[in-house]
Amino acid sequence: MSVIRPKLPEDPIRYDPAAAFAAGVVARPAVEGLADRLEAARAEVVASAVLQLPDRLLADYGTQRPASELFAILRTARRIRDAVDRVVMLGGGAGVMGARAVFEACCHPFHNELSRGERGGRPRLSFEGCRFDNDSAQGLLDLVTPHGRQRGDDLLDQWAVIAVAGRGGAMETAAATRVFLAALRDAVGGDARQFAERLVTIATTSDGLADLAPAVGSSDGFRIPDGVDARFGVFTAVGLLAASIVGADVVRLLEGAAAMNRRFREAPVADNPVLQYAAVSYGAGQESGITAHSLSSQSTQLEAVASWYALIRSEHGGRAGAGAGAGCGTLITNLVVGECRRDRLTVPSPGPLGAGQDELGDLVGKTWPELLAAAVARIHDDDARAGRPTADILLPRIDEHVIGQLLQMLMLAAVVEERLVRA
C-alpha cells in the first residue's frame, strides 16, 4: 500500500518597491531605464558560481546519489546527529552567519532549550569564533566541559566541532579552534579515534585548516568550491551541514534557491525580483546618495537573516545599515511574513484578572497574525509620513523553500548591483 505524501508549498516570494518610489529616493522611470544594463548584468551573472551551486548540488544528488557532495554532507550530518547532543560551529563571516540564519529561521524558535526528545533527537547548535569575546567563549566552554562534573558516556554529554576556515585566515577563528579542539580532546580522554569522529573541517583548498582533518585521521573534511565567494557560502557545506544536523530540510532549501535561479534567468526585467531589487538599490544610491541597506522584520526568526545580509554587503566593502533602527540614510527592506507555522494565539478575555487595566478590551478574540498585520500597517504609515525609504519583500511563510528563495535572491541581487556600480 503506497502512501501519497502531500506536496509541500512552493509559493514564490515577491518584491514590492512601491514605498521607495513613493518616498522619492528613486524614480520608477529611472529603474525602468536600467533595463538594458540589467539584461547585460544578468547575462554575466548567469555563468557565475553563486547561481550554479544550488542547481549543481541538486542535479548531482539526483543522478549520482552516493557519490554526490550533498549525499556526503547528509551522511556526515546523520552520523554527527546520532553521536552527540551539541555541535559547536567555529567561524566567522557571512558563510557561518548564513548557517545561523537557516538554523534560526527553519528550526523551532527555542530549539536549544528543548529536551533531546522534543528536538527530535537533533543536537543543539552553538556558534563561536567570530570575535575575541572572552566571556562568550568561556560560557560555551562551561556548557561543553562543566567544571566539577565528570563527562561520561551519556549521549547528552557528547559534543562535536565544525571548524570553518575564517575569511583570510581570521585570527579569531583560528584562536577559537585551537581552544575548543583542546577542550574536545580532553572531553574524549585523548582518544584519537573519538576525537577524529567529533571533528569536521570546512575550508578552501588553499587554507591550512583543510589539512587538519586528515592530519588527525578524520575523513570529514569538506571543501568550499573554487570560485565561490566567501560571502556566499550558505549553500556550501558551511551552511548545509549545520542545517542538516539540526533537522532543517536542506534539499528543500536548495530547491528554493534553484527556484529563484529560474526566475532570475527567465523572468522579464519588470517582473524579476532579483533585477528589480538590484535596480532600486542602485538607483537609490545614484539619485539620493543612499548606499546603506538593511533588512527589518517583526519576526525574531529572521534577525540572523538581517545580520547575514549586512555581512554580505560589508564584506565586499559596501555599507550596510544597522537594521530596523537605521536612519533615513538607509534603504530599509521589510521582510513581511504571511502565514504563521504554529497554532495561532488569540487575545483572551481577562477572566479573573479583571478588565480595563491593560486596555485590551477591543482586542479580545483577535489573533496574533491579525495584530501583526495591524502593526506592519502602522510601521508602513509611520515610514511614509517620515519619508523613510523602504521597500518590502513578501514571504508567504517561513520555511526552507522560502528561506532558500530569499537568500539566493539577496545574493544574486548583490552581485548584479556590483556589476551596475562597476559598469
Regions found by a protein language model. Give the residues of each.
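Active-site phosphate/pyrophosphate-binding segments
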Residues: 186-333, 342, 422-423
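C-terminal catalytic subdomain
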Residues: 292-293, 297-411, 415-423
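Short alpha-helices
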Residues: 159, 163-183, 202-258, 370, ...
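Short helix-loop-beta junction
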Residues: 105-116, 120-121, 183-186, 312-323
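Extended, charge-enriched "interface" segments that sit outside catalytic cores
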Residues: 1-78, 353-358, 362, 378
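Short glycine-rich or small-residue beta-strand-to-loop segments that form or flank ligand, phosphate
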Residues: 60, 86-93, 160-167, 200, ...
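Glycine-rich oxoanion-binding loops at beta->alpha junctions
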Residues: 55-75, 102-160
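Glycine-rich phosphate/diphosphate-binding loops that line cofactor/substrate pockets in enzymes
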Residues: 72-85, 142-158, 280-291, 328
